Structure formats: C-alpha cells, structure tokens
Amino acid sequence: MKALFIGGTGIISTAVAALATDKGWEVTLLNRGSKPVPEGMESMVADIHDEAAVARIMEGRTYDVVAQFIAYGAEDVQRDIRLFQEKTRQYIFISSASAYQKPAAGCPITESTPLINPYWEYSRKKIDAEEVLTAAYRKNGFPVTIVRPSHTYDGKKPPVAIHGHKGNWQILKRILEGKPVIIPGDGTSLWTLTHSADFARGYVGLMGNPHAIGNAYHITSDESMTWNQIYETLAEALDRPLNA
C-alpha cells in the first residue's frame, strides 16, 4: 500500500509517517525539502501551492492514500481535488477540533456536534475546507476522510496554553526559574491533550479503510484534565513548585 504525505515533518505528521512506515506502508513525503527525509521514506520536492509543478511531478503516479496535513482553507482543498481526484483511493484531510461549536452547547463533543466557531479565523477556514470536501464527496464521489485533532503535543512541543514569541519551552523555563505563568481563566476548565504517538495509532487505522470514506473523526485521548492539573503535571515533571 502506498501513501503520499503532503507535509510529513510536523508534530502530527512525523508520528503518523513513522508509524505507517513501521506498519508496512510505502510512504512518500511531498514537501519543499527543507528537512531530512526519515529512513525508509521517499521524497518528492515541490511546493504544494504550485499546482502546475505538483501536477507534473504526479504524472504516472497513484496512491492508495493521500494524507494532507497542511491544507488550510477552501482554496487549498479545491486545488487538491483537481490534483488528486484520479490519483488516490482515499484523501485524508486534517481539520481541527477547534471547528466544533463555540461555546459548546453540551458535552461530550462528538463528530456530529455542529461546526461553528465565530471566534477564530483558523477554525472558520477549516470549516470552509470541510464543506468543500463534503460537497465533492456527495457530488462526485471524491474519497475524503476528515480527521479533527485536538491539542496534540510531543517531546519537542510540550503542551501549554499560552506562550510568547520564544515558543512553548519558554513556559517550562519560567517554571524552572520559579517565575509566574499564565493559566487560562481560573484553571478549572477541562482540556483534552493527545500525544502525537497516540494520535498516529488512530490515524493509521483509518488509512486504507473503505468504511472511513465520507466520514469525519476526531482523534483524541480519552482523558480530560483541568488546566491547573496540566500545569501542575508539568511543574512536577520539572521538580519545581508551580507559580501561577
């Protein structure tokens, strides 16, 4: 089975590509070639935003799965439909759990929760993309599967709520130095974190699965924590008291 990963070097996609390779998938990464290619994977260097260049490099190629990790809005997926309509049996789009209705009308949030987020443009763009893909599936049978991750982290990007221009690790540095950190609200709101390795197991299970075509899934852990608990866990791992 062959898979084309558009991107493939981010927090989520790195873990998915590694696990897919371990499971026997022939993985090709399509990106601008700015990072080393992991062992066992093929590389195609192109900018996905250059449709003509990607069309040329795709000549004579087909894939069981096209895994799109960097598409943002409607224009991105419209381009992908043109590029991959005849090139794949399954197109998996990474959306976002932030697309779900805000404020939430009830819990738990499921895949059937309405997609309405007036507060964040990123989420609205993801919703726009989902609508285009769903319409293409219903009208032309475009083989889309939609995946909505929540807050995903790994060893290179620890889970924090708010950080400055120096990134997530700056928050851990502040905890180490005993400096105060900002926790959302009163710290009691619930949040779901998912390690990228756990996300990858769910994602790879959808790859090549015909029952996933035309459906949407969120992949998250099964544990919710308050933001106070999350930051207390970080401080405990650093063997420092939390100053918040």
Q: What kind of feature is each model-predicted range?
A:
Residues 205-244:
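Mid/C-terminal beta-alpha module of Rossmann-like enzyme folds, strongest
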Residues 163-171, 184-207, 214-215, 229-232:
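Substrate-positioning beta->alpha
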Residues 7, 154, 183-189, 217-224, ...:
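Glycine-rich Rossmann NAD(P)(H)-binding loop
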